[in-house]
Amino acid sequence: ALVERVANIAERLEIKRRILDLDSSGGHVEDAMKAGDAIGASHWMLRVRDDAICHSACVLILAAGDDRLITGKVGIHRMIRIGSEATTRAELNQELREVYAKMKDYLERNGASVAVADLMMTVPNRKLRLLTEDELQEYGLDGTNAVQDDLERIRLTRECGEDFVRRKDDFDRAYERSCAKVEPGQGQEAAYECGLALRAGFGFPDETCPKDSPLSEYQDAAAPDPIQAGTQ
């Protein structure tokens, strides 16, 4: 509910650059998916900082961000309904099959791999499996959201032209290679400053589409403090 309220407030205040810091041990799976859909519909960058965690149901919210920046710990395990009325393994299995079917549909529409849900099933609820950097990339939980990236490419090609999209792709690769990974304690602003220095070499800001040029929101103003939130 908190994340949904934050998303609604950002819409009402017309906040264009939206950064949400996640730091949560989890919560209810259905609530997390509902909150994630609200995040996905309102265009947020989600961060898990080096001193933060995103465990259990929090991972579902992480999947929904337009972009994800992770330096903290992301962990998964089996998710159960705390209010479950199951009394046998068969009843619990049927209940979990329904939950995980919804979860897989949710992950798929948010550009994350459904393999995340399968992996969750193998980790007992009382334990936790931390995901490596490679796994976060493989499962579509870190960096740019694949589905949102497709939508953005379609829009930019329509409004700014194919050359703009090609140059932006080249810039994005250079940014990932040179600037994206932030050392603990360095601060995300260092990555943005690095990216701003790269832009001119790729013809940005673009005269036709200056507002859609990479990091345009950071050009003239310092970044505001991000909103802090968890999934509890």
Predicted feature residues:
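Small-residue-centered hinge/linker elements
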Residues: 1-16, 22-29, 71-115, 119-121, ...
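N-terminal secretory signal peptides
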Residues: 1-22, 26-43, 113, 129-134, ...
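Solvent-exposed, acidic/flexible segments
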Residues: 1-3, 25-32, 51-55, 67, ...
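Solvent-exposed, polar/charged alpha-helical surfaces in well-ordered, non-transmembrane soluble domains
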Residues: 4-11, 33, 37, 60, ...
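Sec-exported extracytoplasmic/periplasmic mature domains
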Residues: 11-15, 40-44, 63-67, 79, ...
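Glycine-rich beta-to-alpha active-site loop
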Residues: 31, 40-83
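Charged, glycine-interspersed solvent-exposed loop segments at helix/strand-loop junctions
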Residues: 82-170, 174, 178
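Low-complexity, Gly/Ser/Thr/Pro-rich intrinsically disordered linker/tail segments
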Residues: 149-232
